[in-house]
UniProtKB/Swiss-Prot annotation:
It comes from the Eukaryota. This is Auxin-induced protein 10A5. Signal peptide: none annotated. Induction: By auxin. The lineage of its organism: Eukaryota, Viridiplantae, Streptophyta, Embryophyta, Tracheophyta. Pfam families: Auxin_inducible. It comes from Glycine max (Soybean). Belongs to the ARG7 family. InterPro entries: SAUR_fam. Keywords: Auxin signaling pathway. One of its GO terms (biological process) is auxin-activated signaling pathway.
């Protein structure tokens, strides 16, 4: 059984390029999160990760998904409205 190295390298390159292109649009100092049933994508300041109200959302994510987030960002299992309320409160701080 033989392997075609060129084909493997091309496929790996393709997947790496796709993953990199998804990360590029997240500004430095921000993180991508996916929220709600429709998995709407938001970018949040990484400073939110230290806030108790946001850590509660992270705990919910850990309970539901563990540390496996196939979307490439954090998946938050709450309604968009709840997420927007938490982030609006954090914006006021």
């Amino acid at each position: 059984m033989g392997f075609r190295i060129a084909g493997i390298v091309r496929r790996t390159s393709f997947y790496t390029t796709q993953a990199a292109s998804k990360r590029v649009d997240v500004p430095k100092g921000y993180a991508a999160v996916y929220v709600g049933d429709k998995m709407r994508r938001f970018t949040i300041p990484v400073s939110y990760l230290n806030e108790p109200s946001f850590q509660e959302l992270l705990s919910q994510a850990e309970e539901e998904f563990g540390y496996d987030h196939p979307m490439g960002g954090l998946t938050i299992p709450c309604k968009e409205e709840e997420f927007l309320n938490v982030t609006a409160h954090l914006n006021e701080l």
